[in-house]
């Protein structure tokens, strides 16, 4: 039985992780739940159903309500609860499904405590990949990627020598604006951007999908996860989102992972590995016609890919700067302060003007993050 802490339990990935746990109750014990939003009713339902001994929230009113409603549960406010879960002896696996880098100190504490890290948070590796990789080697941390693309690559590479790999391919749906002309892109609305043709995701990641910044972040994440050179990591448009990642080996053979576009598949793989367990969700249906298309990304139209490659060349502070600046620009777009086209234009200018510095500690990461947010708010 695995003993789990779920960071971000009321978010999309957190809820789906609990759905998998619900379907395989004999395999899991939920020891800790952490929520970053104010979804009171949902979080209370989760506490009642899974009976965690540790809970953590970021809303002070909700914290006091939990203490009153669940007096036997250890309730914590803000980072204190994440750190309590990260260092609890009875927990062996942390499911990091929160967004941003708020959980970074707890993730590092978990690594130092010998926990397995089930990682659904790409910002952690984008912002602190060098730091995380160093700790993973030092403490022999097992990092299991939940992102569908990286999970697919992980499955293809499992037990194989990366020296035999020619190239990794992440697939991209192309997002909601894939077939719009350059002229049409100047007039897109928030409603246009949030209508993703395949995935049902939060607003921020859906905007990132439309600019392909999400794919840029994933290229950076793949670099830190798999230890290949950035020239050996690529992305291709695959509108059907049935193939999630491909590995081309030196002999020209390509291995891939195929499943319907649902996070339930990579989440279940990570939670149950090394076993393959019966799934409550449906797999591929080959009784109907399936079409698979692949074509290259227009990097002139989507400079986010080139920006990600520049981050990997520069390293240091460029990762946390890129991540934080983009996050603020997306927020400004969603508030109707800037146009969609401004996101990549302003991000390109910010990255061009950024002076790369060393970034080897938590303080460094948070300092660069703060600087990038301020500059992205002003530009």
UniProtKB/Swiss-Prot annotation:
This is 1-deoxy-D-xylulose 5-phosphate reductoisomerase. Keywords: Isoprene biosynthesis, Manganese, Metal-binding, NADP, Oxidoreductase. Catalyzes the NADPH-dependent rearrangement and reduction of 1-deoxy-D-xylulose-5-phosphate (DXP) to 2-C-methyl-D-erythritol 4-phosphate (MEP). Its cofactor is Mg(2+); Mn(2+). The keyword Protein biosynthesis does not apply. The gene is dxr. Belongs to the DXR family. GO terms for biological process: isopentenyl diphosphate biosynthetic process, methylerythritol 4-phosphate pathway involved in terpenoid biosynthetic process. Mn(2+) binds at residues 147, 149, 218. Pfam families: DXP_redisom_C, DXP_reductoisom, DXPR_C. 1-deoxy-D-xylulose 5-phosphate binds at residues 122, 148-149, 173, 196, 209, 214-215, 218. Pathway: Isoprenoid biosynthesis; isopentenyl diphosphate biosynthesis via DXP pathway; isopentenyl diphosphate from 1-deoxy-D-xylulose 5-phosphate: step 1/6. It catalyses: 2-C-methyl-D-erythritol 4-phosphate + NADP(+) = 1-deoxy-D-xylulose 5-phosphate + NADPH + H(+). Its EC number is 1.1.1.267. GO terms for molecular function: 1-deoxy-D-xylulose-5-phosphate reductoisomerase activity; manganese ion binding; NADPH binding. NADPH binds at residues 10-13, 121, 123, 202.
């Amino acid at each position: 039985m695995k003993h789990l802490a779920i960071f971000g339990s009321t978010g999309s990935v957190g809820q789906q992780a609990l759905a998998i746990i619900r379907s395989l109750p004999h395999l899991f014990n939920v020891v800790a739940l952490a929520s970053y939003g104010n979804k009171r009713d949902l979080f209370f339902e989760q506490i009642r159903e899974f009976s965690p001994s540790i809970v953590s929230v970021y809303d002070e009113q909700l914290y006091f309500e939990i203490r009153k409603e669940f007096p036997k549960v250890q309730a914590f406010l803000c980072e204190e609860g994440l750190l309590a879960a990260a260092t609890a002896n009875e927990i062996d696996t942390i499911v990091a499904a929160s967004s941003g880098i708020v959980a970074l100190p707890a993730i590092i504490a978990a690594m130092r405590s010998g926990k397995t890290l089930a990682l659904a948070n790409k910002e952690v590796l984008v912002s602190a990949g060098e730091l995380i990789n160093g700790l993973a080697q030092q403490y022999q941390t097992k990092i299991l990627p939940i992102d569908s693309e990286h999970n697919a690559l992980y499955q293809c590479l499992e037990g194989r020598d990366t020296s035999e790999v020619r190239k990794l391919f992440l697939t991209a749906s192309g997002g909601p604006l894939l077939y719009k002309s350059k002229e049409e892109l100047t007039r897109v609305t928030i409603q246009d951007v949030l209508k993703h043709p395949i995935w049902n995701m939060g607003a921020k990641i859906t905007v990132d999908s439309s600019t392909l910044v999400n794919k840029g972040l994933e290229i950076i994440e793949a670099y830190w996860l798999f230890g290949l050179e950035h020239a050996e990591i690529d992305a291709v448009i695959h509108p059907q989102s049935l193939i999630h990642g491909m590995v081309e080996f030196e002999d020209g053979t390509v291995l891939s992972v195929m499943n319907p576009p649902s996070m339930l598949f990579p989440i279940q793989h990570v939670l149950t590995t090394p076993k393959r367990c019966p799934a409550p969700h449906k797999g591929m249906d080959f009784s109907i016609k399936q079409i698979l298309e692949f074509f290259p990304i227009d990097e002139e139209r989507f400079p986010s890919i080139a920006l990600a490659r520049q981050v990997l060349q520069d390293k240091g502070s460029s990762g946390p700067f890129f991540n934080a600046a983009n996050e603020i620009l997306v927020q400004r777009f969603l508030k109707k302060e800037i146009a969609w086209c401004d996101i990549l234009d302003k991000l390109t200018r910010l990255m061009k003007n950024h002076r790369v510095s060393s970034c080897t500690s938590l303080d460094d990461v948070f300092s660069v993050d703060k600087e990038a947010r301020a500059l992205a708010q002003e530009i």
